[in-house]
Amino acid sequence: MGKRRVDEESDSDIDVSSTDSETELESTQQQQQQQEGATTIQETVDVDFDFFDLNPQIDFHATKNFLRQLFGDDNGEFNLSEIADLILRENSVGTSIKTEGMESDPFAILSVINLTNNLNVAVIKQLIEYILNKTKSKTEFNIILKKLLTNQNDTTRDRKFKTGLIISERFINMPVEVIPPMYKMLLQEMEKAEDAHENYEFDYFLIISRVYQLVDPVEREDEDHEKESNRKKKNKNKKKKLANNEPKPIEMDYFHLEDQILESNTQFKGIFEYNNENKQETDSRRVFTEYGIDPKLSLILIDKDNLAKSVIEMEQQFPPP
């Protein structure tokens, strides 16, 4: 697979050197302003993003960390090492983004696991059970997932439809503009694999992702049992007061902006609570706002044609700088 590089602008040409002739106050102030501006410019970091094939010898621990991040509060329910092995096994498709060469840790990964061919693998069984339990409240979504992901009367290889699990995760400060080329390369690799009669002839793709709800800061509960009952009474009183006021609109946002495009091209999607949601951490997850961040699980099922359509829309909406 070829590499693609995104080059950013080089160092600034602004000259901020002082001169002995600048003795007047106005000149000194101008010089200080230039120096402050130069400091800001120098703090801008230029980074080259290089695209690499996934490497089992190098990317295993980073992939586990990305999986831990992707599964949120429920990451402890799965054997992440086994999932990482499935992602990185020989001849797998997918891409990583690195900045310091092939042997450095990735800043982002995108790959796919063949769920249909791995229905009997323990960790995949566990993952499917988890997903089916989550989608019980969405009947149509749940029914199609059961048809695609459970062993009924047919054998794995005789199934009419095959499903892939897309694993897409990155550092939170990675620009979304790196994602369209990663998806495009994934589609190209799977197309070549189809020609070689490999295991990537998918009809559907399941995407596990994350969103978050912005919530008012919550007061941490005191662990002292003597104060617990008093706190519960206070909370009940607060709820009664809030009930008399107009309800605040629920604010949701995306960790992965490309998920909005994927969701717009499918009817099978949903946002769900984590099993192990830690309410006490909501307030500590505040970033740059007065609100806390309450993460949620996002599940998207999209067919092959609509995934290809989504990638084109990603390229249009998130073009390279």
UniProtKB/Swiss-Prot annotation:
Residues 15-39 have a biased composition (Low complexity). Transmembrane segments: none annotated. Residues 1-39, 220-245 are annotated as: Disordered. Keywords: Cytoplasm, Nucleus, Protein transport, Transport. Involved in nuclear export, actin cytoskeleton organization and vesicular transport. InterPro entries: BCP1_family. Residues 230-242 have a biased composition (Basic residues). Its main location: cytoplasm. It comes from the Eukaryota. GO terms for biological process: protein transport. It is found in: Cytoplasm; Nucleus. The keyword Cytoplasm applies. This is Protein BCP1. GO terms for cellular component: cytoplasm; nucleus. Belongs to the BCP1 family.
